Amino acid sequence: MDEEPTENIGSDSGTEMGSEPATADGRAGRVVDRLGELYWRKHYGGRDAFECLVRTVLSQNTADTASQRAHDALMDRYGSETPRASGRDGGPASEASGTSSDRGSDGEHGDPRDDEGDLAAALADARRDDLAETISPAGLQNQKAETLVRLAGRVREEYDDAEAFDEFVTTGDPGAVREALLEMTGIGPKTADCVLLFAGGQAGVFPVDTHVHRIARRIGLAPADADHETVREHLETTVRDENCGFGHTAMIQFGREYCTAREPACLEGPEACPMADLCDEVGVFPETGAVVDPAEALAGDD
């Protein structure tokens, strides 16, 4: 079996599910069941919520390997030297350090891990230029450093520390948690949903990245012109709750191996794609070799 994708978010946080798939209702359920047969069926949860938030920020607009290097460097410099006592692995407050200063909100500090190993406190007080240098492998380091310092400051001010934030994410009402995350500047729907899935272990959450957005519309599981949120709503209402998590990670892997943006396997014929009998091939024209975004194909039909 191939290594699971999105190492920067969920690679080792899943536990294997039973080999018998749940009965699928409709085509979306059949697609996800087949993805489970191709790759893996796992339950997710158990990641530290704030660290998961950090991982998702680092993963934006970069490759997994690059964001993983940035994450490792950040944790080496700012993370706790020992696991938290909890044993977990892995009204809006004003934005801390919301100026162009290269320091955190509390000025200059010595060891960034002085505050009892709390990652949120360490990043809230981090020098922004030092943090940017540390996470440079992820790219857009200045922007991401500013986002991380701001998020850390808000977590510390609103929840006191990373552990309290983790408790909120893992025990709070999922809808309220998602709403609170989306109120944080720099956090979009995919990031919020990844935190709910990989940290909160919430069933029924299907984060939508570029792969999922493309594949769901190409197969015909969502309207061709649907935006990310509409795709998410379609998947979360047509895929069984317990299958949404591995459906997300397995669909990403399927997008990398078979259903790529420009050269999907179906161009070589239906036998080249394990999803051929379930796919509408919206925007894919094997007879000419043309591949367009599903929304463009829809516009062309008008």
Stretches found by the model and what they are:
Residues 1-4, 296-302:
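Long, low-complexity, intrinsically disordered segments
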Residues 1-13:
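Secretory targeting signatures
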Residues 20-300:
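Catalytic cores of DNA base-excision repair glycosylases
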